[in-house]
């Protein structure tokens, strides 16, 4: 401030002196010197303005930085410094204005006041600097200390990162090698010991595992040591000779913790790991879990297994004994042990999956063998069943043919009871023939027909057969027919008759009929749909017919005396229950065949018995559609073919005789041949004069037969004297029913066959077929 005042004083003196020189004594002025002084004054004015602007901007900068930082410790010094700077700036600003108005009294007073205040502020600022400068120096020292600490932290952080990278790199390498080892627990533990010894420069490494059959001992299974004279590592397989107690304090301590433990030099585990000698370096140990997969039994309950651990013991070389185990080394050991545990768990899973796969393969082989045996048994059963059915079919066909002649006698001389017996025999024979066809041909084509039939006639014939079976077995019989039953209904009469006979046969087989103390009862009545709804295990019927329906309840029961009920003992008895048993639960009484038929007919079937076993009953409820209008049952037309010369070729003697009788009944002149070759020889003879040939040849009946019916027909067409003959063949009904592709018709056209008659051959069917063939040709 004193320098500014001196500069202003010198400027004023120079101005006065220059005025004198310019004007001289006579008042004359030099205009060139006047211009230089003016320039200097203008320069001073600009300088004062710039200095004032600079001084006044400094407090603004200080205020800005004061808002960004905490300046509470130097607040007083900063205020003094700001006041000093502001007053200095004001002085320079007023000095700049004095150059334009040098003789203004207010301006001079203001300039004087500003200079005085600036002098006071400068003195106060100078005093404040005595305390401000030491504080500023302390801040600088703290800043340097913080910078040193930051640099050390940065170095430590870099070191930690490098150690982490080195650790992760080592762990990745060890993990990769461990996972690349064979999936076996011993191979994984061996690889772990080898890789840790290589990575940490170990003197020795040992692996202890629980002894098999001795849960209180640990056995040394792997031991790795390095020889001073050999750079290579030697792996020793140690047997049961090296053991350590599982209750050793060091073993218990290692087993109880997940982290690695540093063992003392006098530790029994450390001495045993160094194979008897005192350990030369520091020793560390860590547990490795040997995970086992839970084995589940058939019920799904897991088997409880205790946790099992292996112990990995690591020994440092003697020259590293002073340093010991660092936290970094222990961390590597712990991470590698965790990875080894994961690898062991994977190996356990693979071993379990391999064993399960082997068990499944063995079970699959056993299953395939059982399947093969079952298939062979099924084929054998089917062959036996087909052979039995084929052996029974021809006698049954003969019986059906004979009964058809009895049903249509030349003179109606039969009494009603005889007619009923013949009709019952015919229905039973037809049922047996149809069942054999279903077993052998239509095994997979179980169907239910819906056509009108006489319910009264069906019930009469069923009662007749049931009474006959009861009397033959020595049991009594009682029937209660329902008079209000409809005459004609729509349904499958053959299936209904079959079910009724099965009910009767089931109860008669369960009764000791030889004692004469049993009585069979048969009743039929109309019932409502919801009548049996509240009985146990009731399966409601689903109405499928349209129009008027009727529900018919068939009930067959057997009554026994108490002595017979006590003596009766069967290996498979009805359940002693008073309530009903549905058809789905009666697999031990009725086969699935009957259950399926009942379901297809939209019915229900169950059995019941009393608590004492005296009475049993089987109930069948079926739903029929009423036939609208009266159906006239016209008798079939029996033609009379007078003088028709027929050659019959049949390889079964009984069937040949029955068919011959049927043809003679139709008025034909019949000559029979026992084989196809005999038939061809008769036709080839010159005296043969036949008009029609009936072929009923079956190659299964006579295995040595060289020709079947189609081949014989082809040979007949090749004969010159018999190429015009009419040929009729007899085929099984199931063959025609299942001939979807028309293979039989195609064979008939190719062989020149004029007609087909379905077995069993009956009088009406054969007469109708012969009439059709004669009319067509």
Swiss-Prot record:
Disruption phenotype: Late heading, altered kernel color and viviparous phenotypes. Residues 184-344 form the GAF domain. Pfam families: ETR1_N, GAF. The chain crosses the membrane at residues 49-69, 77-97, 113-133. It is an enzyme of class 2 (transferase). One of its GO terms (cellular component) is endoplasmic reticulum membrane. PANTHER family: ETHYLENE RECEPTOR 4, TWO-COMPONENT SENSOR HISTIDINE KINASE. The modification 4-aspartylphosphate is found at residue 696. This is Ethylene receptor 4. Its EC number is 2.7.13.3. Belongs to the ethylene receptor family.
């Amino acid at each position: 401030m004193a320098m500014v005042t001196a500069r202003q004083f010198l400027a004023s003196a120079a101005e006065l002196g220059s005025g004198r020189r310019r004007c001289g004594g006579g008042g004359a002025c030099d205009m060139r010197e006047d211009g230089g002084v003016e320039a200097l004054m203008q320069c001073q004015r600009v300088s004062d303005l710039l200095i004032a602007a600079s001084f006044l901007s400094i407090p603004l900068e200080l205020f800005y930085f004061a808002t960004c930082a905490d300046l509470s410790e130097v607040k007083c010094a900063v205020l003094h410094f700001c006041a000093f700077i502001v007053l200095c700036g004001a002085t320079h600003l007023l000095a700049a204005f004095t150059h334009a108005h040098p003789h203004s009294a207010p301006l001079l007073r203001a300039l004087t006041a500003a200079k005085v205040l600036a002098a006071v502020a400068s003195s106060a600022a100078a005093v404040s600097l005595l305390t401000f400068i030491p504080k500023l120096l302390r801040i600088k020292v703290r800043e340097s200390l913080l910078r040193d600490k930051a640099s050390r932290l940065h170095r430590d952080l870099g070191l930690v990162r490098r150690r982490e990278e080195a650790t992760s790199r080592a762990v990745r390498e060890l993990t990769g090698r461990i996972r690349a080892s064979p999936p076996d627990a011993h191979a994984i533990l061996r690889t772990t010991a080898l890789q840790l010894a290589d990575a940490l420069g170990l003197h020795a490494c040992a692996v202890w595992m629980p002894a098999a059959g001795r849960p209180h001992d640990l056995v040394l299974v792997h031991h790795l040591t390095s020889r001073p004279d050999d750079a290579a590592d030697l792996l020793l397989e140690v047997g049961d000779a090296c053991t350590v107690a599982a209750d050793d304090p060091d073993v218990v301590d290692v087993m109880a913790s997940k982290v690695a433990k540093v063992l003392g030099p006098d530790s029994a585990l450390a001495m045993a790991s160094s194979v008897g000698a005192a350990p030369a370096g520091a020793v560390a140990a860590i547990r490795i879990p040997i995970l086992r997969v839970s084995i589940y039994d058939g019920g799904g309950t897991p088997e409880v297994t205790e946790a099992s651990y292996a112990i990995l013991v690591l020994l440092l070389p003697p020259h590293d004994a002073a340093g010991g185990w660092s936290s970094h080394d222990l961390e590597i050991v712990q991470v590698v042990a965790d990875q080894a545990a994961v690898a062991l768990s994977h190996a356990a899973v693979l071993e379990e999956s391999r064993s399960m796969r082997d068990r499944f393969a063995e079970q699959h082989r056993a299953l395939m063998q059982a399947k093969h045996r079952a298939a062979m048994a099924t084929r054998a059963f089917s062959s036996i069943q087909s052979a039995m059915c084929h052996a029974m079919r021809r006698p049954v066909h003969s019986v059906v043919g004979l009964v058809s002649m009895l049903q249509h006698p030349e003179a109606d001389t039969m009494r009603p009871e005889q007619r009923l017996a013949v009709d019952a025999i015919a229905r039973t024979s037809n049922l047996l023939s149809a069942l054999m066809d279903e077993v052998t041909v239509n095994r997979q084509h179980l169907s239910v027909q819906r056509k009108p039939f006489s319910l009264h006639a069906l019930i009469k014939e069923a009662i007749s057969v049931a009474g006959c079976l009861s009397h033959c077995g020595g049991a009594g019989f009682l029937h209660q027919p329902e008079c209000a039953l409809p005459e004609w209904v729509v349904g499958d009469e053959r299936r209904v008759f079959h079910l009724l006979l099965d009910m009767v046969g089931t109860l008669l087989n369960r009764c000791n009929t030889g004692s004469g103390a049993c009585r069979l009862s048969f009743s039929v009545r109309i019932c409502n749909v919801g009548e049996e709804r509240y009985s146990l295990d009731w399966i409601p019927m689903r109405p499928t017919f349209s129009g008027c329906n009727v529900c018919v309840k068939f009930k067959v029961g057997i009554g026994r005396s108490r002595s017979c009920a006590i003596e009766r003992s069967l290996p498979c008895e009805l359940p002693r229950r008073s309530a009903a048993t549905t058809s789905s639960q009666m697999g031990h009484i009725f086969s699935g065949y009957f259950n399926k038929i009942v379901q297809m007919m939209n019915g229900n079937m169950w059995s019941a018995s009393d608590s004492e076993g005296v009475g049993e009953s089987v109930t069948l409820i079926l739903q029929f559609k009423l036939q609208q209008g009266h159906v006239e049952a016209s008798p079939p037309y029996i033609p009379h073919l007078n003088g028709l010369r027929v050659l019959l070729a049949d390889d079964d003697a009984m069937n040949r005789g029955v068919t011959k009788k049927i043809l003679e009944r139709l008025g034909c002149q019949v000559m029979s041949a026992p084989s196809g070759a005999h038939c061809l020889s008769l036709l080839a003879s010159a005296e043969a004069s036949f008009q029609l040939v009936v072929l009923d040849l079956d190659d299964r009946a006579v295995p040595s037969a060289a020709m079947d019916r189609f081949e014989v027909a082809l040979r007949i067409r090749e004969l010159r004297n018999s190429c015009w003959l009419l040929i009729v063949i007899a085929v099984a009904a199931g063959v025609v029913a299942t001939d979807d592709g028309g293979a039989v018709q195609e064979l008939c056209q190719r062989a020149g066959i004029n007609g087909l008659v379905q077995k069993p051959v009956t009088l009406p069917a054969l007469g109708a077929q012969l009439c059709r063939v004669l009319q067509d040709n």
